[in-house]
Amino acid sequence: MGWVGAIIAKELTDAGMNVVVLERGPDRDTQPDFAYPRVIDELEGSVHRKYLQSLAQETIAIRHNGTTSAVPMRRMGSFKPGTGVGGAGSHWSGCHFRALPEDFKIRSIMEQKYGKKILPAGMSIQDFPITYEDLEPHFDHFEYVCGTSGKGGIINGAQVAGGNPFEGSRSREFPLGPNPDYLGAEYFYKAANAMGYHPYPIPASNASGTYVNPYGCQMGPCNFCGFCYDYGCLNYSKASPNANILPVLRGRKGFDLRTMAQVMKVNLTPDGKMATGVNYLDAQGRETEQPADIVILAAFSLYNVHLMLLSGIGPAYDPVTKTGTVGKNYSYQNLNRVSLFFDETVHANQFMGIGGGGATFDDLNGNRNDPTKTGFIGGGIIWARQPGGGPVRGIATAPGVPGWGSDWKKGAKEAMRHSFYFEVQGSCMSYDDAYLDLDPNYKDGFGRPLLRMTFDWHENEIIASQYLVGKAQDMCQVLNPLAIKGDAKKAGSHYNINQYQSTHTVGGAIMGDNPKTSALNKYLQSWDVPNVFAPGANAFPQNNGYNPTGMVGALAYWCAKAIREQYIKNPGPLVQA
């Protein structure tokens, strides 16, 4: 039960509905699960992966293309699906962006501006069936639920100094002001301004001050403990379902939370046109049927797709015929890092950190890159963040430092105290040959076919990586570091499932305006089984340059509003095919 599950449960119980939430993992709350000093254990959180799903029970199979056999992911690597109450919303960092207005209409904008031939062969990007303006009230509400700290750039159409001048217009300022800058962010502002960019504070759902959200949930100011990503917040400072929604849900009439409940499949009527409920395994391994009038798939994005494929909800995507919708347009995030190393006069103190704090700019994001000149479609942000580091999580040493011995110890000490990094987070387009389906060879711990991921980097994303990393390295030169470490993806680079990059997995059950090209309609409702809804990052037709959580939360509120105001009154398809 992550952000989507908590939001939907809150909204539907507000409407007087009875909601049963089935969570595959244990119950968790700030007290006692994230309490100090229990939670600040690098070995437990970042090595043993206490808050992540068990790959022994449930994992994915991965391959680069459709001509090879996939192999299961046996170690947590490229991304980190959560488990337990709070889901990935409890162990995220806190970066909280809104998608840009142009992100909703990327295909239309590209084709209108540059012609249809601008899209490379096999690129399958699609417009969202909704607009930024549709979601603005829900972006706003989610920020206020989360106590997001930041600085608006355009409020009610008027540009405001200090914010993002390229953002969509917002109806009001952030609920809290920006977090304090750490040293790397101060240097980032200096370099970005020198290059003519427009830096602004990263919107962060890490509270910069005391706050009470619209539900009455309290937050305290972040103390820069450095344990955001991989961990639950010990201080009620990082927004999470546990701290910002569940306190008003627990004990509420009509709300039934069942933990250690692994959903196996969605049950359908004999004609496959309606869901009747789900089957799940309880903590004792007993299979139970839970009837339901409405089924909301609120798992991690990959597993929403997995459940749809296992249950026969919608036609599975066929990469050969390009037909079917469930599994198509899987996408990811294009991430690269550049580390800067300084002498002893620059004290970075990497052990301090705030998950979403720092600085970024959008001058290279959205539609501000001309693909006829840069050679790629999309964009990205360059940012400075310091979410916290430590010896167990790893210390990036300067170029030339050996990997062992006394010289390594010296280099690690210098790097820990006198270095920081900038990151390039790029968009990732979708393609005909990047998709999700059921693996024919491997099964999970419950006897079900594993979800199979077919994905690799395409030339578009490799060129984008090289372009954006080049811009980041140009910024670094302004600061005169002793050394710079970090490279862009090289031509022919392959996706590496073993190396952590980002938990921003998107697509696979996308929203659209045509049942032949999308699994869900504009309200996140299945075209094929209208009492099944699947809000989440799985609905993105491709990925933009931002973290997806702000968009995921807004879509959950958008979906819940449609259920409350339309579906309950007149059950059935909310959009006619």
Question: PLM ranges: what are they?
Answer:
Residues 26-51, 82-95:
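Conserved N-terminal glycine-rich FAD pyrophosphate-binding loop of Rossmann-like flavoproteins
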Residues 202-205, 224-228, 259, 264-267, ...:
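A glycine-rich dinucleotide-binding beta-alpha-beta segment and adjacent secondary-structure elements
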Residues 45-47, 51-61, 71-78, 90, ...:
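Conserved redox-cofactor binding core of oxidoreductases
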